[in-house]
Amino acid sequence: MFEEANDTLGFDLATLCFEGSHLELMQTMNTQPAILAVSVIAFEMGRQELGWEPCLMAGHSLGEYSALVCSGVFSFRDGLRIVRKRGMLMQDAVSAGLGAMAAVTHVPRDQLEQWCRLSATETAQVVIACYNSLNQHVIAGHQEAVGVVAELIQRKIPQAGVKYLNVSAPFHSPLMQAAADKLAADLGEHEIREGHCLVISNVTARPYGLQELASLLYRQMTHPVRWLDTMEFLFRQGVSRTVEVGPRQVLTQLMNDTYSSIQTYHFDNPQELEHLHSIFASGHYSRETIAVSIHEALMAAAIARNRNEDMTEYNNGVILPIQQIRELIEQIRQDRNLDMTSTLYRIRDLLQIVLTAKQLSSDEQMKIVRKLPTSKNVVTLIKG
């Protein structure tokens, strides 16, 4: 896949990742495609090795784009092009040294929000850019204003932690507005497809439909990453396991600290990979169990309220896909040589078409899609 990335970007991304200088890698126009490529490659390797398909995906910041590529919404090539452009726009939006980001620990959310409001001026802004957990946030904005908040924290709460991040721009802050406006135009040039599974938006902390994709990615540039709310959503949905893809284990640690009942795994840990492999290997459902689970999801989709009054769209987007799913259910029961993985992919895609055509909300879609047989209710997390 690195060859495809090199061809897409017009430079040797593999060499940049493994041999590039620290200065080159820290430029966000290089960092973003590098992280996306490594994350997608790791996901594909894990999928082939473990034979698992996630029921849902969530990515933190840039990781949301990696999740969209892994879920099939964007092609690998388009994903690389988008984040390369995104990185350039972010880098150009703020002059070097003007912006800053800092990770803050052990400061209550309300207190930090208040200090950001009090420290901001017409010419120097500072906001919370990431709500990572109850005890961890990231602030971003003009360097002067970020510095004022940092001094307040150190003076008022000595036991709190403040660590400046080595980034080239203040992401997820109002300073990215000009970059967001330009990115919006670029997003319209790329094909958006039905994904294999739902992806959670950083802006809403809920799965979104294709019609919301461009607007939410636009807003993600200037709005905070609601990761704490994302973890709460996963917990309330009954998620039992998460697998983190990509460099480091930041999201795994955040999940362990916040919802310890959810089992967490990371691709970098060989022992955890072996454990996952044994789980998935022993978790094969009987064909009849698979067929029954799909039928239950299909019935839920069939009786769900329809909000689409266009009969042509209803026929093409609801009636025909439901017929196709019924035919596939019979194939599952009868054809012992059937490729189960690709068949389940196809059924998930068809069910998503039905739910979208009926104009169901993201939450309604999520409840029905989760009825499909999955790899032990596993969610993939990808750090940006």
Predicted regions, residues:
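Short low-complexity, flexible loop/linker segments enriched in glycine and/or proline
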Residues: A179, T258-S260, F280
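Active-site catalytic motif of lipid deacylating hydrolases and related acyltransferases
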Residues: M1-L36, I329-D335, Y345-S375, V379
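Short, flexible loop segments at boundaries between secondary-structure elements
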Residues: Q263-E288
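Alpha/beta catalytic cores of group-transfer enzymes, especially the acyltransferase/condensing modules
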Residues: D7-F11, G20-S21, Q48, S71-T222
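FabD-like malonyl-/acyl-CoA
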Residues: M1-Q114, T242-P270, D310
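Acyltransferase
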Residues: Q159-Q253, S282-I332, L351-K383
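General structural feature for long, well-ordered alpha-helical segments within catalytic domains
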Residues: M1, I35-V38, A42, D78, ...
